[in-house]
Amino acid sequence: MATRDELVAMNSKQLEEICGLIQKECPLAKQVRYSCTNFYPNICFIVVDALNPQDYPNGISDNSVFLMFRVDFEAKTVEYKRSGFIYLSEKDKRENPKLRYLAMNSMVEIATRAGVKKMRRSQHKDNATSAHKMATYFNEVMKAVVDYTDGYPYKQGVEK
């Protein structure tokens, strides 16, 4: 049985490969990063970010436009975990009573309203297929976000 440090090193190599593959497939991804800790080395997170670090609102990376994926190497699963938020347009607030008192909505919620299906938990067969699934989902969500916000820096919805 491998030690925790060995598991982190082994998983980090796989994550670097996955991040490289995602970066190649996603033209709107400015950076792809991962995190893997000693506390539970088999569960790692990949963040596909659509903003440059200097463009983060208030300099905080959690305020960015990103998708986070959870990769479990022990259970061999890949799933969507969370995303960044976009300010709602005034048109959406007027037309939808559920959104009237909200300031923001998640990127995935905006994409779901545009007809994109949510990513389901899937099996991690190999690095290439998992990276392709994550990249495809990121591209679909970003297409809906670009339509909603009219492009970079994806800050607020625009009335159309």
Located regions from the model:
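Mixed-charge, Lys/Arg-enriched low-complexity segments
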Residues: 84-160
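Short, extreme N-terminal segment that most often corresponds to the first beta-strand
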Residues: 1-23, 27, 151, 157-159
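N-terminal non-cleavable signal-anchor helices
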Residues: 9, 33, 48-49, 66, ...
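Compositionally biased regions
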Residues: 2, 13, 20, 36, ...
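N-terminal cationic leader/targeting segments used for protein routing and processing
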Residues: 12, 31, 43, 53, ...
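Amphipathic, interaction-prone secondary-structure segments
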Residues: 19-84
